[in-house]
Amino acid sequence: MAHKKAGGSSRNGRDSAGRRLGVKLYGGQSAIAGNIIVRQRGTKFWPGEGVGIGKDHTIFATANGNVTFHKGLKGRTFISVLPAAEAAE
């Protein structure tokens, strides 16, 4: 009789779900205090005016206004939330 030996079990075939990281509000969009602007691992973006940073490096708005991205020292990208009248200038 023909027999097939037991096949070895594979050690692959698993993957974790995506973490939904990235920019949630882009430059020029309006933000309300408490809105999440960026979810990130580490400080790819740094907090500027009107913005706070969480323990997981999430950048969030602390004031109402428009989101702006700008370069700073050491090549860092800062995110600020400026009041609508100030951002228009």
From Swiss-Prot:
BP terms from Gene Ontology: translation
One Gene Ontology CC term in the entry: cytosolic large ribosomal subunit
Family matches, as InterPro entries: Ribosomal_bL27 (IPR001684), Ribosomal_bL27_CS (IPR018261)
Pfam families, per database record: Ribosomal_L27 (PF01016)
Recorded GO MF terms: structural constituent of ribosome
Keywords associated with the record: Ribonucleoprotein, Ribosomal protein
PANTHER family tied to this protein: LARGE RIBOSOMAL SUBUNIT PROTEIN BL27M, RIBOSOMAL PROTEIN L27
Membership in a protein family: Belongs to the bacterial ribosomal protein bL27 family.
Protein name in the entry: Large ribosomal subunit protein bL27
Species of origin: Ruegeria sp. (strain TM1040) (Silicibacter sp.)
Lineage: Bacteria, Pseudomonadati, Pseudomonadota, Alphaproteobacteria, Rhodobacterales
